[in-house]
């Protein structure tokens, strides 16, 4: 499963997830693998860039295998709850400021996911 969200406000999860995420997190995910990606604006919201992936991560952590983490090297941001020990919890995408890197980041992430989902 691949779950994606935009980040709204200051690191907030998109409202569309409000009704879905609690019931999804209660599902039997034990034998599933889940990858997360988040869209955000690393320039305007540098201290909360792509934080919304953390909300999803926290809701499903320990209930499934979460795959698709990405090293934070090359990303320009100040802080984010979407990062633990220098590693993003999924793929952060900034089409506003780092659009020139999006294709390469997605391609590398998909190649990693292919190995995980086999």
Which residues make up each language-model segment?
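FMN-binding flavodoxin-like domain, especially the glycine-rich phosphate-binding loop
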Residues: 1-118
């Amino acid at each position: 499963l691949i779950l994606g969200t935009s980040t709204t406000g200051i690191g907030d999860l998109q409202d569309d997830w409000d009704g879905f995420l609690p019931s999804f997190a209660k599902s039997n995910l034990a034998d599933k693998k889940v990858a997360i990606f988040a869209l955000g604006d690393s320039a305007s919201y540098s201290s909360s860039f792509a934080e919304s992936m953390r909300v999803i991560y926290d809701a499903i952590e320990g209930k499934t295998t979460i795959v698709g983490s990405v090293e934070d090297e090359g990303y320009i941001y100040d802080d984010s709850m979407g990062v633990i020990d220098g590693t993003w919890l999924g793929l952060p995408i900034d089409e506003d400021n780092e659009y020139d890197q999006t294709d390469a980041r997605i391609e590398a992430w998909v190649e990693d996911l292919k190995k995980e989902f086999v």
